[in-house]
């Protein structure tokens, strides 16, 4: 049976990290974070918890980017007290919502002016280009300090920042190669990207990192995970070749 590419990155019972290592739990948590298009941000409102819907995007190093308006209460909270947490969730395995994989990341948030980070955010949330340059909007970066990952019912892991975050050297290596990877795949292998996307239309690779990559078609963006973290451009090529073969084999089986 061909291996189907992992899409949307929700851990399932078959890859339960509780049955493996803490590193596997960290990888599953990163998959959820990098795939998340919506999350719940918890800030402090004069000492009281305040929960807000936000649209996160992960930088290559897993810091969490959020485009926030200063008109929003949660932004004012962060400016007064940068300590916060964010919850993102996957898809439940059954009718019981407690089977939903989820991760809560705690840390501190700061406003930043970084064109590369802004481009990263807009690659994940292209619709936000409509208001990203409004005067009241700023990009914030949440630096993870620790996390609580729950792979499903009664499958919890506490992860410190050092365990959760990807290898810094690998992050830097892939980040340095990313532009070349995107250009090569988009210009030379659009058919492979279409096979992996398994959906009509022209798909472009818009990000690549140690944990996976994102494909976009207009404002639709899909996340795909590697089978394991990669550390080099060669590792990415190996993963993409395997995913393309698996996707094409699956397409043949279903037609």
Language model features: what each stretch is:
Residues 1-255:
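Binding-site signature for planar aromatic cofactors or substrates
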